[in-house]
Swiss-Prot record:
Keyword Ion transport tagged: yes
Keyword Acetylation attached: no
Designated name of the protein: ATP synthase epsilon chain
SUPFAM superfamilies recorded: Epsilon subunit of F1F0-ATP synthase N-terminal domain (SSF51344)
Family statement: Belongs to the ATPase epsilon chain family.
Pfam family, any one: ATP-synt_DE_N
Cellular compartment(s): Cell inner membrane
Superkingdom in the source lineage: Bacteria
Keyword terms: ATP synthesis, Cell inner membrane, Cell membrane, CF(1), Hydrogen ion transport, Ion transport, Membrane, Transport
Record function comment: Produces ATP from ADP in the presence of a proton gradient across the membrane.
GO MF assignments: ATP binding; proton-transporting ATP synthase activity, rotational mechanism
Length: 135
């Protein structure tokens, strides 16, 4: 399988940089996979789990929004936050969800809609992480 270069960058660090076979991205308009030779595209990333496949092994990384750019040079993801699933503190993540829920009553209109959507994404990540941890 052909490989391509992938960089995953967050404000804190370069979370990943190297040659990969495939990257599956949680896009705002739907999840999508990137392989070598993918058409150029820029896409918004929603909070979710990004999966990197390289050399037959998979690495899963929680991203909490950002931008993905596919070009002839490869794939670059600029993530708001990028944390390996093994490094996620489940208690802190649950507390973040609780705080988000408590803040909902103070929001209206579009702000409320965006907050509910973000909360739903966080709950989905929490479910995926807890399901993965059980296997």
């Amino acid at each position: 399988m052909a490989t391509f270069h992938f960089d995953l960058v967050s404000p804190e660090m370069v979370a990943f940089s190297g040659e990969v076979d495939q990257v599956d991205i949680p896009g705002a308009e739907g999840d999508f996979g990137v392989l070598a030779g993918h058409a150029p595209v820029v896409a918004v990333i929603r909070p979710g789990i990004l999966t990197v496949t390289a050399g037959g092994a998979q690495q899963k990384i929680v991203v909490l929004g950002g931008i993905a750019e596919v070009s002839e040079k490869g794939l670059t993801v600029l993530a708001d936050v990028a944390t390996a699933t093994a490094d996620v503190d489940m208690q802190d993540f649950a507390e973040t969800i609780t705080t988000m829920e408590q803040q909902l009553p103070g929001k209206v209109g579009d702000e409320l809609d965006r907050s509910i959507e973000r909360l739903d994404h966080y709950k989905s990540i929490q479910h995926q992480l807890s399901t993965t941890a059980m296997h």
